[in-house]
Amino acid sequence: MYGEQQMKLKNFLIVVKDIERSRQFYEDLFGLEMLVDNDGNMVLSDGLALQEEKYWKEFLGKEIIPESNSCELYFEEADIEGFIKKLESMYPEVKYVNRLMTHSWGQKVIRFYDPDGNLIEVGTPI
């Protein structure tokens, strides 16, 4: 073990073009609240951090690839049909990867992109 405390995962970060638009999106749909607002970086409840694309590109020196499908944010919701109604009424332009489907193990899920092409899955509890 390094030092006296065990390392732990603190946050996960997604890159966004418009941090305020993204904050509103995650607040509206998932009830996440802003905890920290730094210039171009925002931490929301449940460990989600938002980083403005212009700063991220500067840090990495690489282009951001929306809809890369290399990872997803996963949420669970018992009332998935109610969530879909909320999603479609608040964000009718949402781009689906797959509409409501049921996996072979019985879990209902939907997948869609946030406004910046980050993949989101919402499923019934496993």
Label the model's feature ranges.
Residues 1-21, 71-73:
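N-terminal beta-strand motif that seeds the catalytic metal site of vicinal oxygen chelate
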Residues 2-5, 85-126:
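Vicinal oxygen chelate
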Residues 8, 40, 46, 69-71:
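Residues that flank catalytic or metal-binding motifs in active/ligand-binding sites
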Residues 13-56:
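Core segments of cupin and vicinal oxygen chelate
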Residues 18-19, 78-80:
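Helix N-cap motif at beta-to-alpha junctions
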Residues 25, 81-87:
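Short amphipathic alpha-helices within nucleic acid-binding modules
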Residues 42, 71, 106-110:
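Short beta-strand micro-motifs in enzyme catalytic cores
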Residues 59-63:
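Short, P/G- and charge-enriched loop/turn segments at secondary-structure junctions
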